[in-house]
Design a protein with these regions (language model features):
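Catalytic cores of alpha/beta
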Residues: 1-8, 100-136
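Conserved anion-binding
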Residues: 2-85, 89-90
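Generic beta-sheet signal
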Residues: 15, 40, 116, 138-139
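Electropositive phosphate-/nucleotide-binding environments in soluble metabolic enzymes
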Residues: 19-22, 65-69, 96-99, 122, ...
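Alpha-helix-loop-beta-strand connector modules within alpha/beta enzyme cores
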Residues: 24-43, 94-121, 155-165
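C-terminal helical cap(s) of enzyme catalytic domains, especially alpha/beta-barrels
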Residues: 25-32, 126-166
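Internal alpha/beta core interface subdomains
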Residues: 69, 73-112, 126
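Short, loop-centered acidic/histidine patches that primarily coordinate divalent metals
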Residues: 88, 118, 139-141
Length: 166
């Protein structure tokens, strides 16, 4: 961790290690500041708990048994300064983000939440921002050249959300 930060990283997102050893969140926050500790949460709709999501780890393959909203709150209480929230159910589909998930997590924590999974166009980013996302991560929409960064930014701006000019 120290090496990564010394190479110029401002933040480090941790998922699997945090689930396996939650005290790591506090250790990182105390050593480097909570602004550096980003809790990465990979969320899947739960088959066990209707209307809820379960946190996964190991690249979305392993069940944690943690309710996502409760895990986000616990992570913040332990020292996480941001949440990187990914909907595994929507990831790569480019059909919109899980707005219910975004609302549930952003209303439960008082730290910035970066949301990912499902962006197919600029309107999806606008919807996520309106649902409470502080920032949006997107990949497939750009990897598969469905839209350019400039087109996304134009759509986002047209939707009334502030975005830095290219």
């Amino acid at each position: 961790m120290r090496h990564i930060l010394s190479m110029g990283a401002d933040k480090v997102a941790i998922n699997t290690a945090a689930i396996k050893r939650p005290a790591l969140i506090t250790e990182v926050a105390e050593a480097f500041g909570s602004q550096c500790m980003v809790l990465s949460i990979q969320a899947k709709r739960s088959r066990t708990w209707p209307g809820k999501w379960e946190a996964y780890y190991d690249n979305g393959r392993a069940h944690s048994g943690y309710d996502v909203v409760e895990w986000a709150k616990r992570g913040v209480a332990l020292g996480a300064g941001e949440i990187l929230l990914t909907s595994v159910d929507c990831e790569g589909l480019q059909q919109g983000m899980d707005l219910e998930l975004i609302k549930a997590v952003t209303s439960a924590v008082n730290v910035p939440v970066i949301c990912g999974g499902g962006v197919g166009c600029g309107d999806d980013i606008v919807d996520a921002a309106q649902a409470g996302a502080d920032a949006v991560a997107c990949a497939a929409v750009l990897h598969y050249k469905k839209e350019t960064v400039q087109e996304l930014k134009d759509d986002i701006r047209a939707g009334g959300v502030e975005v830095r000019k290219v």
